[in-house]
Amino acid sequence: VEQDEPPAGHARDEGLRALGVQRTRQRILTAARHHLIAVGYRSLSLEQVATDAEVTRVTIYRQFGSKLGLLDAVAEDLAQRAGVVAGMHAAAALDDPVAAFRAMVSETCRFWNTDPDLFRRLVSLSAVDPEAHRVISSREQWRVGQVAEFVARLAEADRLRSPFGPDDAGVTVAATTSFTTCDDIATRLLIDHDRLDNLLLPMLNGVVRLGRH
């Protein structure tokens, strides 16, 4: 038996409802980001976040489950805003391992430039709060894993410099391109993070061969 399709008005109402939920979620994330940077995680008041987002605390708990869930969503929103996953996939799709590695470094620097203030707070928070560390370290481990894959391609192409093996080179490249390292350089030189690839790549050429054989 064929079922009647829902009326057009019903579908439109559902679409508007979903759009409203998404806008509410974004207001909460924006407010949470602001207060997280200003006061840190421990002093983060869900009541204040709710007030700024023009919702109730119940709405926050309904959407994010807990304060830690809200932190996780803020971190995920940062990655979504930056488009870092798509950027890394685009770099990995390059056939030349050297070009792919260069693109990965540039993408990483662009990622750090998305929201340096929030990155600083997340990194410092990860160092002192065990719960937050679990949320944030999983994302950093993803980045480190991505770096290892790009380095492995260079190793297969005989592009590692002595005395580096794949593991040594991967750890060194990951540390050199970490937010902490990049932020220190950018802050001292008063330049944007997305300009750091021009400095990092010559440094990393001491680990991997990025020029012609």
Q: How does the language model describe each region?
A:
Residues F64, S124-D129, F179:
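Short helix-capping/turn signature of helix-turn-helix
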Residues R110-V123, E131-A157, D167-V171, P202-R209:
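Amphipathic alpha-helical packing segments from all-alpha helical-bundle domains
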Residues V21, R25, A75, V105, ...:
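Amphipathic, non-transmembrane alpha-helical scaffold segments
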Residues L36, L71-L78:
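Alpha-helical DNA-contacting segments of helix-turn-helix folds
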Residues V1-V55, R62-G69:
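Basic, helix-initiating cap at the start of DNA-binding domains
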